[in-house]
Amino acid sequence: LEWAKMDRGSMTEEEAAASMCSRLPECLHEQAHLLVDRWDRPILPVPGMAELVRKLKEAGYGVYLLSNASYRQHEYWPRVPGSECFDGTLISADVKLVKPCAEIYELLYSTFGLIPGECLFIDDSAPNIESAERTGMPGIVFHGDADELRSEMKAFGVKV
């Protein structure tokens, strides 16, 4: 509940922690605050993904991030290996829209001047891919393996 609201940009982290604490026994309040304050710490880079992103960029492809995330994404993102290769980012909290709603994909296209049929969307959620495809952007469901993704991208004509 709180996470979805933070991703939509309709709740701050402080409000989320307070909301969680209102439903938890006092002995768990500190853990609720830690969860909200440190959500990004256990996230580890996918092996091979930074290299793949760099190769895409070197090959001349545009690389963009469309993420369902809270405002904290702006702090976290620069620490992600390969993030420097991205041409643009669109964070759900900033635009008050979340995947899989079609409007967020349309906003991605208009913000960065993208043509959906010339893009390839990669996401770990099948409903997000299906929604992107309904707006004209083909996609691949990412299962956590960069080498597998590279092979799947070749089927779409991506050369890396």
Q: What function would you assign to each model-found segment?
A:
Residues E14, L28-Y64, A102, D147:
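Short, acidic loop-to-helix structural element flanking the phosphoryl-transfer center
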Residues S10-M11, Y61, G113:
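Residue-level recognition of short, well-ordered coil/turn positions
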Residues W3-L35:
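A metal-dependent, Asp-based hydrolase signature
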Residues E2, R38-P42, V95:
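Short histidine/acidic/glycine/proline-rich micro-motifs that form metal-
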Residues L1-A4, E51:
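Positions in alpha-helical segments
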Residues R54, S70-V160:
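Asp-based, Mg2+/Mn2+-dependent phosphohydrolase catalytic module
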Residues S67:
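Conserved phosphate-coupling serine/threonine residues in phosphotransfer and NTP-handling enzymes
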Residues D7-S10, I43, P47, P116:
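Residues at alpha-helix boundaries and short interhelical turns
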